[in-house]
Amino acid sequence: MPKVGMREIRRAQLIDATLRSIDEAGLPGTTLASVAQRANISTGIVSHYFGDKDGLLEATMRHVLRDLWAATTQRRVAARKDPRSRLRAIVAANFDDTQVSAPVMKTWLAFWSQSMHDAMLKRLQHVNTRRLHSNLCAEFAKALPRAKARQAASGLAALIDGLWLRGALAGGPIDTRAALKLAHDYIDLLLASD
């Protein structure tokens, strides 16, 4: 009989091993066997929990997305209630420590690439894109007319993605302070233009 709670412990262990494997070997070098080896368990156990490599990547990205959504919620709740503060909180969540470690950044890059070929991953990416746009639009709509709020949300989402992508591809630790300053300046510009 399995130990109570072992399933979640094992899944977390395997997701961590997947993040490390993608960090060290990339997605092509990440296999059920490489993940099992990093987790010190059998390949059969990885198969039991995730089925195949696609299932493992999907579960890993769901974990990363939950971390992003938790950081977004936590920062929005802690922010002052004005749109500027809440927009800054959303931006900061995208550059949260849970999103900018080397293993997570490389996993995001692998996920984006693979989502163009896998329907489930494409759906996850679509949900994430819509959620970001919706959150930004809701805050901009408190200060701007509806059409301008939508346009501002699209622009800020593109800026977040662009700053994050440039940081991920820079080859070293991401300069979150510089990224946040650029995004904050953009928010200030948009809110001042109304």
From Swiss-Prot:
Gene3D superfamilies: Tetracycline Repressor, domain 2 (1.10.357.10). Residues 8-68 form the HTH tetR-type domain. Pfam families: TetR_C_6 (PF13977), TetR_N (PF00440). Residues 31-50 bind DNA. Pathway: Amine and polyamine biosynthesis; betaine biosynthesis via choline pathway [regulation]. Keywords: DNA-binding, Repressor, Transcription, Transcription regulation. GO terms for molecular function: DNA-binding transcription factor activity; transcription cis-regulatory region binding. GO terms for biological process: glycine betaine biosynthetic process from choline; negative regulation of DNA-templated transcription. HAMAP family: HTH_type_BetI. Repressor involved in the biosynthesis of the osmoprotectant glycine betaine. It represses transcription of the choline transporter BetT and the genes of BetAB involved in the synthesis of glycine betaine. PANTHER family: HTH-TYPE TRANSCRIPTIONAL REGULATOR BETI, HTH-TYPE TRANSCRIPTIONAL REGULATOR RUTR. This is HTH-type transcriptional regulator BetI. It comes from Burkholderia ambifaria (strain MC40-6). The lineage of its organism: Bacteria, Pseudomonadati, Pseudomonadota, Betaproteobacteria, Burkholderiales.
